[in-house]
Swiss-Prot record:
GO CC terms of this entry: plasma membrane
Intracellular or extracellular location(s): Cell membrane
Topology relative to the membrane: Multi-pass membrane protein
Keyword vocabulary terms for this entry: Cell membrane, Membrane, Transmembrane, Transmembrane helix
Protein's UniProt name: Uncharacterized protein AF_0172
Species this chain originates from: Archaeoglobus fulgidus (strain ATCC 49558 / DSM 4304 / JCM 9628 / NBRC 100126 / VC-16)
Transmembrane parts of this sequence: 13-35, 50-68, 75-94, 109-131, 152-174, 194-216
């Protein structure tokens, strides 16, 4: 069984979530990030082989983080539902979406392991979720149909969430990039489209980290 999720561009969501937690980076948190990525396929297929060691180790680390930071319980309950759903959903398009949200796991867990509080996590996690939802909606339209007016309308809630929860400069940059990616989506290859979404994710995380480092968030 392949170790990495066969879900196309959703690994970029994992990368974004991991990079978003860079200021919390420790050996423990690096292990959390890697085990999160390596646990998706074993949980989906539940084959009785060595790969099950990854979700077992991830569960052990999650329990340890819960011991360190009781706030962890809220996130564990939410993400447990996502990881369990991977086992029971057989529709590929739905499976991909669930997998993408499950792979946002590193950021909150790395922050919690470092001792971050609930309010410190909620705003960036909401931004990450909103961008993930936008990307998934746009990708679904691009791959299985055509990008249409509904995809342009989806930019509105994305922009509002970013303007409310982040710095105006970051909100403007992400909104502008989202518009460009949406406009170009139908006219470029699927591969180029995937790189465009990766660029959008990296623009968000680099901008967020830079503004956070500068004390502007």
């Amino acid at each position: 069984m392949r170790l990495l999720p066969k879900m196309g561009g959703v690994i970029s969501i994992w990368l974004t979530s991991t990079l978003l937690a860079m200021k919390y980076l420790t050996p423990l948190n690096l292990a959390i990030a890697l085990l999160s990525l390596l646990s998706v396929n074993p949980l989906m297929y539940m084959k009785k082989d060595f790969s099950l060691v990854f979700p077992i180790l991830l569960s052990a680390l999650a329990a340890y983080i819960l011991y360190l930071n009781p706030t962890t319980i809220y996130f564990l309950l939410a993400y447990s539902i996502l990881f369990i759903a991977l086992k029971f959903v057989n529709e590929w398009r739905i499976e991909t979406k669930i997998g993408a949200f499950a792979l946002t796991f590193p950021f909150p867990m790395m922050a919690l392991a470092y001792g971050a509080g609930l309010m410190e996590i909620l705003a960036p996690l909401t931004l990450l979720f909103s961008l993930t939802a936008f990307n998934l909606f746009l990708a679904d339209s691009r791959i299985y149909g055509r990008v249409s007016a509904k995809n342009y309308l989806a930019i509105i809630p994305l922009a509002l969430i970013f303007y409310i929860l982040s710095h105006p400069v970051l909100a403007a940059a992400v909104t502008a990039a989202a518009i460009v990616v949406t406009v170009k989506a139908n006219s470029i290859s699927v591969r180029s489209f995937g790189f465009s979404l990766l660029f959008l994710n990296l623009l968000f995380v680099v901008g967020f980290l830079a503004l956070d480092f500068a004390g502007l968030l």
